[in-house]
From Swiss-Prot:
InterPro entries: Haem_Oase-like_multi-hlx (IPR016084), PqqC (IPR011845), PqqC-like (IPR039068), Thiaminase-2/PQQC (IPR004305)
GO BP term (any one): pyrroloquinoline quinone biosynthetic process
Molecular-function GO term, any one: pyrroloquinoline-quinone synthase activity
Keyword Oxidoreductase: yes
Role played: Ring cyclization and eight-electron oxidation of 3a-(2-amino-2-carboxyethyl)-4,5-dioxo-4,5,6,7,8,9-hexahydroquinoline-7,9-dicarboxylic-acid to PQQ.
Main EC class the enzyme belongs to: oxidoreductase
Keyword annotations: Oxidoreductase, PQQ biosynthesis
Known pathway: Cofactor biosynthesis; pyrroloquinoline quinone biosynthesis
Domain of life per record: Bacteria
Reactions catalysed: 6-(2-amino-2-carboxyethyl)-7,8-dioxo-1,2,3,4,7,8-hexahydroquinoline-2,4-dicarboxylate + 3 O2 = pyrroloquinoline quinone + 2 H2O2 + 2 H2O + H(+)
Designated name of the protein: Pyrroloquinoline-quinone synthase
Keyword Oxidoreductase: yes
One Pfam family from the record: TENA_THI-4
């Protein structure tokens, strides 16, 4: 039996974009947020748990840089680190997220402590960082292509949150506004790497699975938040109301 022919670049890009059907913008938790049905606790829980994702993104990108021998790719990819960590003397996305936390009524020190991060969220994010460390730099870079769908999710928050949640300080929306442009720029670079690297049908199918893996991570994070903040069944809820779960173990 002959091997299946590779998809053309246009067909491959179309297949990648079709994965947007599984993006977490469609998760009931996110739908509730942009439809105005989320409670203050649910929004605060989302902001607190997503902070763990935010602080780990630079570590993911640093792993890609460490594994990449191509200087030109590194020169462009390093901008992602600066976007989140900030350049010397400048704030980055992490500080912008802390301001979002303040805007929804969370203390920055509590966010930094990560005491509100649910185990399910921590496991999902850690799996993503570990994948980036162990995979080839091309596969790790391509896993970032959920950014294909990110501008829509940022815009949905900017469009709906001020209307539905007047108690949120509008200054907190800076992160979403900034990421609109950054995500579009990052998509161009990531898509170029992906379309150039995956040239056989088997490699293209593997890349689609990698993208699904990343979508699974984002969806699983919201599943954990749904259990805790919608169904009121956080970890160990049958035996205690205390947050007894681990707060991160250095390995």
């Amino acid at each position: 039996m002959s091997e299946a022919l590779p998809l053309s670049p246009a067909e491959f890009e179309q297949a990648l974009r079709a994965k947007g059907a599984y993006y977490h913008i469609h998760h009931p938790y996110h739908v509730a947020m942009y439809e105005g049905r989320a409670t203050r606790e649910q929004i605060q829980g989302w902001v607190a748990n997503r902070f763990y994702y935010q602080v780990n993104i630079p570590m993911k990108d640093a792993a890609i840089l460490a594994n990449c021998p191509d200087r030109e790719v590194r020169r462009e990819w390093i901008q992602r680190l600066l976007d989140h960590d900030g350049a010397p003397g400048e704030d980055g996305g992490i500080e912008a997220w802390l301001r979002l936390g303040q805007a929804v009524g969370l203390d920055p020190d509590q966010l930094r402590s990560q005491e509100l991060v649910l185990p399910g969220v921590r496991f999902a994010v850690d799996a993503y960082v570990n994948f980036a460390r162990r995979a080839s730099w091309q596969e790790a870079a391509s896993s970032s292509l959920t950014e294909l769908f990110a501008p829509q999710i940022h815009q949905s928050r900017l469009d709906s949150w001020p209307q539905h949640y007047p108690w949120i300080d509008p200054a907190g929306y800076e992160y979403f506004r900034t990421r609109l442009g950054q995500a579009r720029r990052d998509v161009e670079h990531g898509l170029t790497i992906t379309l150039q690297h995956y040239t056989t049908r088997a490699a293209q199918e593997r890349m689609l699975e990698i993208l699904q893996f990343k979508l699974d991570i984002l969806w699983s994070m919201l599943d954990a938040m749904s259990m805790a903040y919608e169904l009121h069944r956080p970890p160990y809820h049958t035996v205690t109301q205390q947050r007894v779960w681990h707060k991160g173990i250095a390995l």
